[in-house]
Amino acid sequence: MYGVLSSPLELTGDFEKDIDIAYEYFSTAINDRKKRPTLFDKEVFIEAHEIIEGRPEGFWHVISLEENHHFKVLPCVNDGNIELCNQNCNASHHAIVVKYGAETRNVCLLRASRLPWIIDIIKLAGKNDSSVNVWLKPGTGRQNGKLYLRYNHHGADFVLIFSVEKRFYRLISSFPVFYTNEKENFDKDYRKYAWSYFDT
């Protein structure tokens, strides 16, 4: 049986209000260590060292995308959020600077609306639910291994990527998967690196 994801956050199209809505969810469900689920008996770490506009960098990272990423097809093309953001992913009218000034990212209301899926997918993976493909790519040199959780059912294709640390998994990215080549690459990686905590 496949698990089902929560409904996306209901947004308004007013960027400031929508960022507040997303941040309220992030603060209570994701950033609160007492409420945040564990993953395979390890804590999930959310980056919070850098505070930008009163909010941790980890929040901005999961609701935005790199400014230099230009889309041929918008990720929200079949989603109601396309009417709300005025193509901010390409227009850059709502940008945030992270990594102490080293990177500019564009706020993405599609990603913001999908914040509940981060918690859902972590919980489903923790139950060994067949809706989530899990794979572990080994690190190279000084680079840590990467743990991938991909939900691809009921019309939703969404991936979480974690850096594997000694005592925790550090969330480094989460996003909808919509490019054909990206889907194929993830399918290929899953076939090569499939991993199960429950078989170890």
Regions found by a protein language model. Name each.
Residues 1-200:
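Ribonuclease/tRNase effector modules and their secretory precursors
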